[in-house]
UniProtKB/Swiss-Prot annotation:
ATP binds at residues 144, 305, 364-373, 375, 398-401, 425, 452, 458. Pathway: Sulfur metabolism; glutathione biosynthesis; glutathione from L-cysteine and L-glutamate: step 2/2. This is Glutathione synthetase. Pfam families: GSH_synth_ATP, GSH_synthase. Catalyzes the production of glutathione from gamma-glutamylcysteine and glycine in an ATP-dependent manner. Glutathione (gamma-glutamylcysteinylglycine, GSH) is the most abundant intracellular thiol in living aerobic cells and is required for numerous processes including the protection of cells against oxidative damage, amino acid transport, the detoxification of foreign compounds, the maintenance of protein sulfhydryl groups in a reduced state and acts as a cofactor for a number of enzymes. Participates in ophthalmate biosynthesis in hepatocytes. The keyword Phosphoprotein applies. It is linked to Glutathione synthetase deficiency: An autosomal recessive disorder characterized by massive urinary excretion of 5-oxoproline, metabolic acidosis, hemolytic anemia, and central nervous system damage.
Length: 474
């Protein structure tokens, strides 16, 4: 895709002035992060990195991503309710991956005891890149679906005003008008509010499981503020707090500091290093409770890379979404090539193909949080080490998506504005709420565009690689 801002990107003096204005507007709008030096304090904050200009995104692909989001919501919900599918799919992974195994153990314990929760809440984000086809046209291909702690809905609600401001300064009012309104934080809060309401206890609270050091607190506060506007109170606690002050009554209702909890919203708990033994015990306590968890443990497992790979097998979508051929077709159209590395002929073939053409593949472990994937020579070395080991079952191979690079100017605290070749990743936020077996809400609630320099193979905004952006539909 050719850039709309080509000539503007060549004028260094104008770029520097625009960058100053854009940064001030970002700060005024609340596009904020705590600093890496003081991640526990809001005394000193900075702007979250962002692009100076919105990046061009084909309208048809944006519409396609929105159109398929409710199908992905249904699919994740269906997977989370299918214990046999999860067990079969993850059977080889849990033998080799301790983290997935610990999550799965909690899942099994809860199933054995009987699931106490009756209201289920999904806040997810499906991420895509635009694959360059043979004829040069871009195609929407899913990278992953995030089913736990899907972030940046709050900050993405505040960036459109920044890019409108930049274009207005340039007297491009018509172009400024094309930047889509976007308010994921409101939509995500609506889902939490619906789950809270269905829980049926007006004095109960929402519990946000937070990290001790949280730079991205303003993203979370945006959702908290939306809930408070509906008179729903949120308390922030760590896993350590829960192990000290959390308890269940005889009906398995959850209490923290003596206050009943209706909804547990996890913004922690998606990486192995976030769990001590004490934290695992706290997670089990939360999982056993009657409160609506976002996500419950089965939904977190539904978001693993291994599940993503198995869903791409012929017949899997039809089995999970019976009688919904249109939804199946929409979902399948977004799938990139995904390959099992389980021990056996199929896995051997996938490894051989990746070693023969490493530039065509990405090696993915069962990890969230960005910056975990292996490419190129790193991938080749890892595959050579793994190919004769059962440990390879804890990874999947994925076709490498090759988007068309474009120029934009990236703004980061402490760094000069720089024009670089970039690629973007589009995320669509989805919300669903289920009571027992009845789906009471299923919607898409906004988008997130993140852009990074092409020299960075992997990593998101939180990992310090990508920056916030907005789609400019073309």
């Amino acid at each position: 895709m050719a850039t709309n801002w080509g000539s503007l990107l060549q004028d260094k003096q104008q770029l520097e002035e625009l960058a100053r204005q854009a940064v001030d507007r970002a700060l005024a709008e609340g596009v904020l992060l705590r600093t890496s030096q003081e991640p526990t304090s809001s005394e000193v904050v900075s702007y979250a990195p962002f692009t100076l200009f919105p990046s061009l995104v084909p309208s048809a692909l944006l519409e396609q991503a929105y159109a398929v989001q409710m199908d992905f919501n249904l699919l994740v919900d269906a997977v989370s309710q299918n214990a046999a599918f999860l067990e079969q799919t993850l059977s080889s992974t849990i033998k080799q991956d301790d983290f997935t195994a610990r999550l799965f153990d909690i899942h099994k314990q809860v199933l054995k005891e009987g699931i106490a929760q009756t209201v289920f809440l999904g806040l997810n984000r499906s991420d895509y890149m635009f694959q360059r086809s043979a004829d040069g046209s871009p195609a929407l291909k899913q990278i992953e679906i995030n089913t736990i702690s899907a972030s940046f809905g709050g900050l993405a609600s505040r960036t459109p005003a920044v890019h409108r401001h930049v274009l207005s300064v340039l007297s491009k009012t018509k172009e400024a008008g094309k930047i889509l309104s976007n308010n994921p934080s409101k939509g995500l809060a609506l889902g939490i509010a619906k789950a809270w309401e269905l829980y049926g206890s007006p004095n109960a609270l929402v519990l946000l499981i937070a990290q001790e050091k949280e730079r991205n607190i303003f993203d979370q506060r945006a959702i908290e503020n939306e809930l408070l506007a509906r008179n729903i109170h949120v308390i922030r606690r760590t896993f350590e707090d829960i192990s000290e002050k959390g308890s269940l009554d005889q009906d398995r209702r959850l209490f923290v500091d003596g206050q009943e909890i209706a909804v547990v919203y996890f913004r922690d708990g998606y990486m192995p290093r976030q769990y001590s033994l004490q934290n695992w015990e706290a997670r089990l306590l939360l999982e056993r409770s009657h409160a609506a968890k976002c996500p419950d443990i089965a939904t977190q497992l539904a978001g693993t890379k291994k599940v993503q790979q198995e869903l791409s097998r012929p017949g899997m979508l039809e089995m999970l979404l019976p009688g919904q051929p249109e939804a199946v077709a929409r979902l399948r159209a977004t799938f990139a090539g995904l390959y099992s590395l389980d021990v056996g002929e199929e896995g051997d073939q996938a490894i051989a193909e990746a070693l023969a053409a490493p530039s065509r593949f990405v090696l993915k472990p069962q990890r969230e949080g960005g910056g975990n994937n292996l490419y190129g020579e790193e991938m080749v070395q890892a595959l050579k080490q793994l190919k004769d080991s059962e440990e390879r079952a804890s990874y999947i191979l994925m076709e490498k998506i090759e988007p068309e690079p474009f120029e934009n100017c990236l703004l980061r605290p402490g760094s000069p504005a720089r024009v670089v070749q970039c690629i973007s990743e589009l995320g669509i936020f989805g919300v669903y709420v289920r009571q027992e077996k009845t789906l009471v809400m299923n919607k898409h609630v906004g988008h997130l565009l993140r852009t990074k320099a092409i020299e960075h193979a992997d990593g998101g905004v939180a990992a310090g690689v990508a920056v916030l952006d907005n789609p400019y539909p073309v």
